[in-house]
């Protein structure tokens, strides 16, 4: 197993540990499961994110977290946020601030009744 592939598989837990021990520099990264949400937040609040590495480049994908830490460190410093306030911004305020699209339920193509 490639070391970077293994690290990538544990990046969420590693990010929580890094945040626990050094919250000034790291943030808990749960966006690995909600990557599109991170980009919507960045677009909404004009945060320049680093370019996304190729899926096959495990080293670059691992290092992407470090780049995100640098970006959010600067964002936190510029906006005078504490580490806890950055987490509140990323995981509570920003997702709830973004307009939600209401999904239209498509009309059924067939009508039927099921009788037991």
Regions found by a protein language model. Give the residues of each.
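A sequence-level detector for short glycine-anchored, His/Arg-bearing signature motifs
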Residues: 9-10, 116
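Hydrophobic/aromatic-rich effector regions of fungal transcription factors
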Residues: 18-22
């Amino acid at each position: 197993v490639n070391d970077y592939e293994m690290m990538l598989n544990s990046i969420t837990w590693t990010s929580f540990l890094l945040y626990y021990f050094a919250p000034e520099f790291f943030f808990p990264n749960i966006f690995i499961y909600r990557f599109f949400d991170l980009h919507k937040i960045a677009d909404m609040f004009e945060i320049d994110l680093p370019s996304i590495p190729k899926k096959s480049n495990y080293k670059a994908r691992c290092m992407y977290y470090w780049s995100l830490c640098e970006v959010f460190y600067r964002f936190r410093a510029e906006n005078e946020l504490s580490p806890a306030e950055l987490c509140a911004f990323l995981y509570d305020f920003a997702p709830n601030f973004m307009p939600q699209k209401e999904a239209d339920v498509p009309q059924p193509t067939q009508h039927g009744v099921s009788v037991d």
